[in-house]
Amino acid sequence: MIRRTSGFSLIELLTVVAILATLVGLLLPAVQAARESARRSSCSNNLRQIGLAAANHESARGRFPVGAESRQWDERPDFPHQFFRWSVLAHLAPYYEQEQLLRSLDLSVPLYVGLSPGDIAPQNKPLVKLTIPLFLCPSDIATAVADLFGPTNYAGCTGSGVDGGSPFETNGMYGINSRTRPRDIRDGLSKTAAFSESILGAGPKATTSPDGIEPATGYGFTFATPLTAAGCGRPFYYNFTDLRGFSWANGEYRTTLYNHARQPNGAALDCLSALMTTPDKSRMYAGYGWRTARSRHAGGAVVGMADGAVRFMADSVDPAAWEATATIAGGEAAPLP
């Protein structure tokens, strides 16, 4: 008696494998898209929480926080005022719902109490090094890019950048010693950008050539202050520190300030400069910048509006509308993107 054993033929097995491979090929992009959708939703929620903290600050103090702080240190009147440098994110510390540790920040002393980058007041040093999930977009690398500081993907909007990227007297919500009130935002809170996102830097790279430097993670440095198209078109140094977003505590264009001088995720390197030679201690070391919104999301970046709402702005947004969204009282006729 011949016994027959059941099983798969080679052709049947290969057919099943091919079907499974096809299913995986169809499902994997959907799974990846779902994960990115969740990450983008989390990123949007972070901006909502930051916007809520700004609203709570305004309710408590009658104005929104400064974008960056610059003032005389009474203990050392000869010290550059820019060394105070506390950012808008730092000034919102008492108003975050879930970040109790940040309420211990001592903002009565400068961020930098000496001339070295490591000269941070002892009471603040362990705090400014913290990596805070609220300040990080989960679509990005979400890791520190500097030894002494915790990173951030989020920045306050200084305006259109048409003033050569100056951080002073800006036409947006935030800037050095800005004290914007709701009534100052004549264009309307729902039509004015307050915060957006950027991409963290990847570490120091080239110092003299743009080769291999991605606009997403690098900068071009120029000696033109205020910034000019010619100066930013041919910077003297490229990506010289590449510390984009290196610190949520630092109020400057490399970290917690941005503007709408260029469209989101633009192909050109963002451009920075520093005011080094002025005798004016209130402005010495101030950074000028044309730094736009950037993200790891496909097709655009998330923007937090002044009323606390969030919007996804496409890379292809009309430049006039993008610029209009940045100003608080420009009276532009361009429709909201």
Show which residues each predicted segment covers.
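N-terminal single-pass transmembrane signal-anchor helix
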Residues: 4-39, 43, 49
